[in-house]
């Protein structure tokens, strides 16, 4: 599983309603060969499971994704930044449920399955979170 930057969503743009209208959820893509191998069609709903979590999404089959890879667009599925109801001095603040839409890649987790304690899975070469190589399983819902 890899992630890629969105052309519309980021932490700075997640609160813009017009962008959510144009693209309400993030793209989850597979190569068409993988779709055929797993009996998946463009638009199917799938469950993606990693060592750190799972999520459901609608898939797109795209030739630009390398076979064997699940590609998820980063920048969706926010839990705050106006997505949750809060109060200030007893007054409810405005919020927008749409900001929650899509998969938050962080919720698929970067938990290291090789450790006995909760720990972030780090790339041994770069020392960064394993964001571009999470092992994942995909199945039709």
Segments (PLM) and residue ranges:
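Long, contiguous, secondary-structure-rich segments that constitute the structural scaffold
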Residues: 13-29, 33-141
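Long, low-complexity segments enriched in small/aliphatic residues
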Residues: 1-16
